[in-house]
Swiss-Prot record:
A molecular-function term among this protein's GO annotations: alpha-1,4-glucan glucosyltransferase (UDP-glucose donor) activity
Protein's recorded name: Granule-bound starch synthase 1, chloroplastic/amyloplastic
Alphabetical list of NCBIfam families matching this protein: glgA
Annotated organism of origin: Oryza sativa subsp. japonica
Entry keyword RNA-binding: no
Length: 609
């Protein structure tokens, strides 16, 4: 599958934006927004409903036992309560991750488990994970005209059953850093057998709840059974609902099971040659769900199959990772990547992501010079700025505003737009720190800015986690000039550390950053990744100049406190996910408790050498 970027689908027409929407009414930090079809008589294609986070009624609430000092908040699960939820995805942090998908499958499941649900996450075994054990359970999976044997590895962490599908197509391809080799040998290059690999994942995931006898949790025993909700994530799991309906339900298996499909990035859809459909071993009934025609010649010209399209059409509920991104997806071809009409048909619900507040905690962060909370942030951030300036080789002066950019160096994140705005910013008394890795052309571009403006710009084009933490703590403003951003994590991390964001007005950035309260909005940027629009450069430069003028004022200090006083954890999003999944009506499902997540005691993932 070759990546389909929004630049390939950009049109000359204006996109879907928030021209005068600096503080949109849909901005509910822990709310969710559902878009459902109206009847034809309704006129508009969609109707919009906004619902705030709901709390369980007293009858629904179950007891939570507060544990010892070592375990400050331990959930006690009630046997038979809640739901059986099975997440399936190609990534699962911290074991495997290239972006937001891995973060969601790493962070959301523990939060749902804390609410009393039995939760499993299924992902490929890309490496020799030392904390995952061989269950000795195997399954025979039919792929094309042959059968492949998969094994199931397992570990139980933070209240969640983590299941890894073991097969040579996953394990033998990934050497070095797992995140760099999940989908192909190099960035932008896919493995030719990705259809086979992820077909294996989908079919093995359907076997796991029935055959894995898991007894790690004292309140949940045995297999998950058949009354489960499968939560599929992105194109790699698109065929799962079809396999469920084709291979299981006609035989009386999983009769009550339901499937939710979550879109993390519409730009990657799993488009393959139409002639490959028989290799999926699905009946003709499902061919139309995969059938897709576009005007591009990758991976082949003309008619194709589209895994994400099938995932959307065959699911019982479609979701995405922020309310505003849901609006963008149905707004037209440019932002819906040719599936906008399908999503207008099915409806789509947006729920904002949370973040790992234990890993990113300025009151305990070992990588920063001065630890702090909302009450001590102003002085502590000044000390951290001085440490950051020294680390970056910039003049140490806490009075100089410091802007930071952290992100993957690819078109979506706008590093080229950021670089183009730097010359205009050099007119100001300002320092800029750039951190990221990715496409070589962008790495060279950022380094050229450092060479052109020594003493004012520093570019680090390598992975450096300690520096990322110090930047969050020491920067005055975090620049997020994304062309599109389904949800975004970087702005959440910045606000967690009291760093207001200057961001593009797209996707989850609209739902999480409030103009004048927690950050600054640049407006909508072009989704055309092939060019840097001069108007976009002006928007980025003007917004950052506006932010620079606020730094050091009482208004800025208030913004810092506003950022830090938010609950950015997964607790609110998990409750919204619970409400949506309960609506699917799987037999035996019940609302969860008001619990707290079990925090990890140590680093979870250690791969073998």
């Amino acid at each position: 599958m070759s990546a389909l970027t929004t630049s390939q689908l950009a049109t000359s027409a204006t996109g879907f934006g928030i021209a005068d929407r600096s503080a949109p009414s849909s901005l509910l930090r822990h709310g969710f927004q559902g878009l459902k079809p109206r009847s034809p008589a309704g006129g508009d294609a969609t109707s919009l409903s906004v619902t705030t986070s709901a709390r369980a009624t007293p009858k629904q609430q179950r007891s939570v036992q507060r544990g010892s000092r070592r375990f400050p908040s331990v959930v006690v699960y009630a046997t038979g309560a809640g739901m059986n939820v099975v997440f399936v995805g190609a990534e699962m942090a911290p074991w495997s991750k290239t972006g937001g998908l891995g973060d969601v499958l790493g962070g959301l499941p523990p939060a749902m488990a804390a609410n009393g649900h039995r939760v499993m996450v299924i992902s490929p075994r890309y490496d020799q994970y030392k904390d995952a054990w061989d269950t000795s359970v195997v399954a025979e999976i039919k792929v094309a005209d042959r059968y492949e044997r998969v094994r199931f590895f397992h570990c139980y962490k933070r209240g969640v059953d983590r299941v890894f599908i073991d097969h040579p197509s996953f394990l033998e391809k990934v050497w070095g850093k797992t995140g760099e080799k999940i989908y192909g040998p190099d960035t932008g290059v896919d493995y030719k057998d990705n259809q086979m690999r992820f077909s294996l994942l989908c079919q093995a995931a359907l076997e796991a709840p029935r055959i894995l006898n898991l007894n790690n949790n004292p309140y949940f025993k045995g297999t998950y059974g058949e009354d489960v909700v499968f939560v599929c994530n992105d194109w790699h799991t698109g065929p799962l609902a079809s396999y469920l309906k084709n291979n299981y339900q006609p035989n009386g298996i999983y009769r009550n099971a339901k499937v939710a499909f979550c879109i993390h990035n519409i730009s990657y859809q799993g488009r393959f040659a139409f002639e490959d459909y028989p290799e999926l071993n699905l009946s003709e009934r499902f061919r139309s769900s995969f059938d897709f025609i576009d005007g591009y010649d990758t991976p082949v010209e003309g008619r194709k199959i589209n895994w994400m399209k099938a995932g959307i059409l065959e699911a019982d509920r479609v979701l995405t990772v922020s309310p505003y991104y849901a609006e963008e997806l149905i707004s037209g071809i440019a932002r819906g990547c040719e599936l906008d009409n399908i999503m207008r048909l099915t409806g789509i619900t947006g729920i904002v992501n949370g973040m790992d507040v234990s890993e990113w905690d300025p009151s305990k962060d070992k990588y920063i010079t001065a630890k702090y909370d909302a009450t001590t942030a102003i002085e502590a951030k000044a000390l951290n700025k001085e440490a950051l300036q020294a680390e970056a080789g910039l003049p140490v002066d806490r009075k100089i505003p410091l802007i930071a950019f952290i992100g993957r160096l690819e078109e979506q994140k706008g590093p080229d737009v950021m670089a183009a705005a730097i010359p205009e910013l050099m007119q100001e008394d300002v320092q800029i720190v750039l951190l990221g890795t990715g496409k070589k052309k962008f790495e060279k571009l950022l380094k050229s800015m450092e060479e052109k403006y020594p003493g004012k710009v520093r570019a680090v084009v390598k992975f450096n986690a300690p520096l990322a933490h110090l930047i969050m703590a020491g920067a005055d403003v975090l620049a997020v000039p994304s062309r599109f951003e389904p949800c975004g994590l970087i702005q959440l991390q910045g606000m967690r550390y009291g760093t207001p964001c200057a961001c593009a007005s797209t996707g989850g950035l609209v739902d999480t950053v409030i103009e004048g309260k927690t950050g600054f909005h640049m407006g909508r940027l072009s989704v055309d990744c092939k060019v840097v629009e001069p108007s976009d450069v002006k928007k980025v430069a003007a917004t950052l100049k506006r932010a620079i003028k606020v730094v050091g004022t009482p208004a800025y200090e208030e913004m810092v406190r506003n950022c830090m006083n938010q609950d950015l954890s997964w607790k609110g999003p998990a409750k919204n996910w619970e409400n949506v999944l309960l609506g699917l009506g799987v037999a035996g499902s019940a609302p969860g408790i008001e619990g707290d997540e079990i925090a990890p005691l140590a680093k979870e993932n250690v791969a073998a050498p």
